[in-house]
Each structure stands twice: as structure tokens, then as C-alpha cells.
Amino acid sequence: FANTIRLLINKVREWKNKQSS
């Protein structure tokens, strides 16, 4: 479960980075 949350946060962070660019 914790692994899934970490993966989700990672994706969100990547998405935010792409949006920022």
C-alpha cells in the first residue's frame, strides 16, 4: 500500500514538473 502511494506521489511530482516547464 505504502509503495503505491509513493509511486503516485512520484507521478504527481513528475506531472507538476512538466506543467512548470
UniProtKB/Swiss-Prot annotation:
It comes from the Eukaryota. It is found in: Secreted. Signal peptide: none annotated. GO terms for molecular function: toxin activity. The modification Serine amide is found at S21. Expressed by the venom gland. The keyword Ligase does not apply. The keyword Iron-sulfur does not apply. Keywords: Amidation, Secreted, Toxin. One of its GO terms (cellular component) is extracellular region. Belongs to the cationic peptide 04 (cupiennin) family. 09 subfamily. This is Cupiennin-6b. It comes from Cupiennius salei. The lineage of its organism: Eukaryota, Metazoa, Ecdysozoa, Arthropoda, Chelicerata.
